[in-house]
Curated annotation (Swiss-Prot):
<protein>
    <recommendedName>
        <fullName>Large ribosomal subunit protein bL12</fullName>
    </recommendedName>
</protein>
<dbReference type="InterPro" id="IPR036235">
    <property type="entry name" value="Ribosomal_bL12_oligo_N_sf"/>
</dbReference>
<keyword id="KW-0689">Ribosomal protein</keyword>
<dbReference type="GO" id="GO:0022625">
    <property type="term" value="C:cytosolic large ribosomal subunit"/>
</dbReference>
<comment type="similarity">
    <text>Belongs to the bacterial ribosomal protein bL12 family.</text>
</comment>
<dbReference type="GO" id="GO:0006412">
    <property type="term" value="P:translation"/>
</dbReference>
<dbReference type="Pfam" id="PF00542">
    <property type="entry name" value="Ribosomal_L12"/>
</dbReference>
<dbReference type="Pfam" id="PF16320">
    <property type="entry name" value="Ribosomal_L12_N"/>
</dbReference>
<comment type="subunit">
    <text>Homodimer. Part of the ribosomal stalk of the 50S ribosomal subunit. Forms a multimeric L10(L12)X complex, where L10 forms an elongated spine to which 2 to 4 L12 dimers bind in a sequential fashion. Binds GTP-bound translation factors.</text>
</comment>
<dbReference type="InterPro" id="IPR013823">
    <property type="entry name" value="Ribosomal_bL12_C"/>
</dbReference>
<dbReference type="GO" id="GO:0003735">
    <property type="term" value="F:structural constituent of ribosome"/>
</dbReference>
<dbReference type="InterPro" id="IPR000206">
    <property type="entry name" value="Ribosomal_bL12"/>
</dbReference>
<keyword id="KW-0687">Ribonucleoprotein</keyword>
<dbReference type="GO" id="GO:0003729">
    <property type="term" value="F:mRNA binding"/>
</dbReference>
<dbReference type="InterPro" id="IPR014719">
    <property type="entry name" value="Ribosomal_bL12_C/ClpS-like"/>
</dbReference>
<dbReference type="InterPro" id="IPR008932">
    <property type="entry name" value="Ribosomal_bL12_oligo"/>
</dbReference>
<comment type="function">
    <text>Forms part of the ribosomal stalk which helps the ribosome interact with GTP-bound translation factors. Is thus essential for accurate translation.</text>
</comment>
Length: 124
């Protein structure tokens, strides 16, 4: 029984955030690859030498949900588009990454929303 690419994509589309994370880890182990972007040697040297350069991509990390956990789950659902179960798993698994490689403005907006809901957030 052969699967078509469309069937594979449809299956992947229906995975939760947690399941997608596990799938990526399995790919990394099975094929001995990394999901991390490759850094060009010249670019790394330039970034280290130029302390004045501003970072353009940021990760938003939920450190703690705080006392208003339900409000934080609602905001996480809104931001990530995850279902209730997935959003709860993200919040319960803190510290966890909410969004990766977003602009500074988007990262600050997400941080503001989560902090207003009662969470402790870090932007890296």
């Amino acid at each position: 029984m052969a699967c078509t690419f469309e069937q594979i994509l449809e299956t992947i589309e229906n995975l939760t955030v947690k399941e997608l994370n596990e799938l990526v880890k399995l790919f990394e182990e099975k094929f001995d690859v990394s999901a991390q972007p490759t850094v060009v040697a010249g670019a790394a040297g330039g970034a280290a030498g130029g302390a004045g350069e501003e970072k353009t991509e940021f990760d938003v990390i939920l450190k703690d949900a705080g006392a208003k956990k339900i409000n934080v789950i609602k905001v996480v659902r809104q931001i990530t588009g995850a279902g209730l179960k997935e959003a709860k798993e993200i919040v319960d698994g803190a510290p966890s990454t909410i969004k990766e490689a977003v602009s500074k403005e988007e990262a600050e907006e997400i941080k503001k929303q989560l902090e207003e809901a009662g969470a402790t957030v870090e932007v890296k």
